[in-house]
Structure formats: C-alpha cells, structure tokens
C-alpha cells in the first residue's frame, strides 16, 4: 500500500514537471514570436516573402538604400529618379543590353533574359504612386526568385516628381506574397498587367523614353539600347563579346543590328535562317514597315537577307546615315546621350541617331545578329494623341538640328 502511494506520488511529480516544461516552452515560443513580430514592425520590409537562395539579404539592403535616398530630380524637375533599385556587378567593358518599360511591360524581361546571356539594365517608369509601390515589390520578387535577375540585371525606377516610392508595408503583402518561383512571378505579372495602347498611360504624365534610355545605359562603355518588347537573336551577346575581345576598336563606329517585327502568333526566330524563312513568306517584315518605311530603309534589308551565311558575327557593309534613319546599334567611345526633352511619341530616337552622324560616327550593319519586335506595328495600336505629339516633337527636332550646328561647329555633316 505504501509502495503504491509512493509510485503515485512519483507519477504526479513527473506529470507536474512535464506540464511546467510545456508551459515554459510555450512562453519561450510566444516571446520569440513577439520579438519577430516587433522586428517586422521595425524593419518595415519584405518579410512576407518566403526565404530564398543567396544574395536576398543584399537585395533587401540595396532596395532599402535606394528607396531611402528619396531619389533625385531629373534636369527638368518633372521626374524623380531612383538609381540602382537592383544592382549587379557589371564589367564596364562588357556589352550591356539597355532597355526601358512601364510597370505592365516588365513581363517582357523573361524573354530578354532567355536570349541575352550578358548583363541587362532596365529603367522602369511608374506613372502613379501605386505603380511605384508595385515596381518595388516586383523588383524584390523577381530578384528573390530569379537567379538570373540577381546575377545579371540592374533596375532603376522613374516616377513623377510629386511621388516618392517607399518600401511596402509587410502587413500589406499584395499580389506577389505567396509566389515561390521565378516562373510564378512572371505568370502573375502577366495576369495582373493591363496591356494598353502604346504610350497611353491613362494619366496626364508623359512617358520620358529618352530619360529612361540614358538611365539604363549609364556607365556602360558599350550598350545595345532597345525597346523591352524586342527580342535579340540567339547568341548575339556572345558574338558581340568575341568581336570586342578581338578588336577593341569600336570607337567612332556604330554597329547596326537589323530590326524586324513579327506577327504575334508566330514563335520568335532564334537564328538568321529561321528569320529569313519567315521574312520570305511575309510573317516577318522590317521594323516600322507599316508606319515609317524610310525610318529603317537605309539598313538595306534585301541586301542583308541575301548575305552568305557565316558562323562569326562581323560588320558586313557600311551605310551612310540619312534622315530619317533611326537604327538600333552598339557603339563604343563617347556616344551622345539621348535628348531628354523628347517625350512620348516621335523623334526621340532619330534625334540621337542624327547627333551620332554629326559627331562623326559611321554606321556598319552586322551580318548575322538581329532584333525582332513582338507584333506588327500598326497605326491603330497607338493612342489618339500620337499625331499631336509627333507634331510637337517635329518642331523640337528642327530646333535640335540647329543646336547641333553650334555644338559641332567643325563638323561637315548635317542632318
């Protein structure tokens, strides 16, 4: 009887000790949870995203630093610029693919990352405060889940000067909180994007294309500046790097990459052979063929498609610049910047091509590489204000050409 009583006492003591241990563990758990929650409140950062592979802490730090700066105003005072929302290590002597996009059009980065194997720099324009916030969330989500974004992409943000971008509140995770992979981020972006008519922002803010171009190519000795909805041919970056490694003599020469456009239903051609087959049946045509044939005609597409096939990328023939040619090109040396007074539609690229010509650059067309725009450019796909903007920029272009005479008084070339 006494032994039974002793056993029962020992059992109750053991049970009491176990209950006390459980209680202590629960208190410890609640304390840690409270501390973590307080850290979230303090940090005001992207803790609603799941843990990701290496460099995520660096991404968060860089985003925080870029946004905390408050940005800087552009020369006009109309736009606020946040440099280095995302940063990557870029060799200044590498060939950079520089592009620009509205927030909706960031979905095209997926195709660029697949085709362009080198460094890429993108300037993003957010027309509203909500878009600016979405851009910061996207920057983190893409770099968090896409290793190529972390390794190869620099991202900058531009918004109207009256807005300031800020780090999103972790209590409001939004559309991208539960995504787990790079493909999921791009799929989600494609679903929430609102494809619209070219340059129709739905606000009274002008799209600052030349400011965005300059920002994207800033600091690069060699850059191919393209629109985000264009895709380069496979291996173009490797071919350009090999050319650069062999010659290192690009100063004063603009290497023209022929540009085409394709019906949207078609798969993007990877090489010149595939492109030429589509070109011959009318599924691919010169860029801007339906809007401004002379704008690309000097490229001499008939000559280019009939060049003999070669394994190495090289300049094939020289083309004297003539108005209104606005080629896409890679150049080294002191390339003139894009004039940031040109906004919205009209004369924003030709003005820079014109200055290249006056500054003494020569144009040589590459034999194998090319660019393809997704879809045929058609007049009906532009916003109603296109013609008014074009006329405004046409007057500005005339003024710009007069200014070039004063800027290059010893140049025999004119536009």
UniProtKB/Swiss-Prot annotation:
Its cofactor is Mn(2+). It catalyses: 3-O-[beta-D-Xyl-(1->4)-Rib-ol-P-Rib-ol-P-3-beta-D-GalNAc-(1->3)-beta-D-GlcNAc-(1->4)-(O-6-P-alpha-D-Man)]-Thr-[protein] + UDP-alpha-D-glucuronate = 3-O-[beta-D-GlcA-(1->3)-beta-D-Xyl-(1->4)-Rib-ol-P-Rib-ol-P-3-beta-D-GalNAc-(1->3)-beta-D-GlcNAc-(1->4)-(O-6-P-alpha-D-Man)]-Thr-[protein] + UDP + H(+). GO terms for molecular function: glucuronosyltransferase activity; metal ion binding. One of its GO terms (cellular component) is Golgi membrane. GO terms for biological process: axon guidance; protein O-linked mannosylation. It is a single-pass type II membrane protein. Its EC number is 2.4.1.-. Residues 37-415 are lumenal. Its main location: Golgi. Pathway: Protein modification; protein glycosylation. Glycans are attached at residues 204, 300. Keywords: Glycoprotein, Glycosyltransferase, Golgi apparatus, Manganese, Membrane, Metal-binding, Signal-anchor, Transferase, Transmembrane, Transmembrane helix. Mn(2+) binds at residues 227, 229. Residues 1-8 are cytoplasmic. It is an enzyme of class 2 (transferase). The chain crosses the membrane at residues 9-36. Pfam families: Glyco_transf_49 (PF13896). It is found in: Golgi apparatus membrane. Beta-1,4-glucuronyltransferase involved in O-mannosylation of alpha-dystroglycan (DAG1). Transfers a glucuronic acid (GlcA) residue onto a xylose (Xyl) acceptor to produce the glucuronyl-beta-1,4-xylose-beta disaccharide primer, which is further elongated by LARGE1, during synthesis of phosphorylated O-mannosyl glycan. Phosphorylated O-mannosyl glycan is a carbohydrate structure present in alpha-dystroglycan (DAG1), which is required for binding laminin G-like domain-containing extracellular proteins with high affinity. Belongs to the glycosyltransferase 49 family. Interacts with LARGE1 and LARGE2. This is Beta-1,4-glucuronyltransferase 1. The gene is B4GAT1.
